[in-house]
């Protein structure tokens, strides 16, 4: 994966991820959400999924830090929540939603110091 530089790179990267996860990998993404929901009440069985999620969060936080965003933890949490919302929206309600405006607005708002 190429290095993500600056807010524009973060926007492009997030858009590409949502497009991929709701396009070519849509079946896998739906299955992952089904598993998350089904295993939410079972700490032991759900641990492998939660571990993968934590690894994804750590990777996202590393990108946020590399982009130069101060206070990376809440920014990472917000980006992850936005990503989840956009993924679910595209998979269930509006598969053709133009995600770029929402991602741009969020990233620009989160990168203001």
Short names for language-model regions:
Residues 1, 29, 60, 87-94:
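Short amphipathic alpha-helical interaction/hinge segments
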Residues 1-29, 76-79:
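Hydrophobic alpha-helical connector segments
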Residues 12, 23-46:
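Amphipathic alpha-helical segments used for helix-helix packing
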Residues 15-18, 36-37, 61, 65:
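Amphipathic alpha-helical segments within well-ordered protein domains
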Residues 21, 39-40, 86, 90-91:
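Generic structural signal for hydrophobic core residues of well-folded globular domains
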Residues 27, 31, 48-55, 59-62:
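Short, solvent-exposed amphipathic helices
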Residues 45-50, 54, 65-113:
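Hydrophobic/aromatic-rich alpha-helical bundle segments in the mid-to-C-terminal region
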């Amino acid at each position: 994966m190429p290095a993500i530089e600056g807010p524009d790179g973060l926007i492009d990267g997030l858009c590409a991820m949502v497009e991929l996860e709701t396009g070519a990998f849509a079946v896998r993404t739906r299955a992952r959400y089904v598993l998350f929901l089904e295993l939410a009440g079972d700490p032991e069985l759900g641990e492998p999924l939660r571990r993968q999620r934590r690894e994804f969060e750590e990777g996202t936080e590393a990108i946020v830090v590399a982009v130069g965003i101060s206070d990376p933890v809440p920014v990472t949490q917000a980006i992850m929540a936005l990503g989840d919302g956009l993924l679910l929206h595209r998979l269930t309600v509006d598969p053709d939603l133009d995600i770029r405006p929402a991602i741009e607005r969020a990233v620009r708002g989160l990168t203001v110091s």
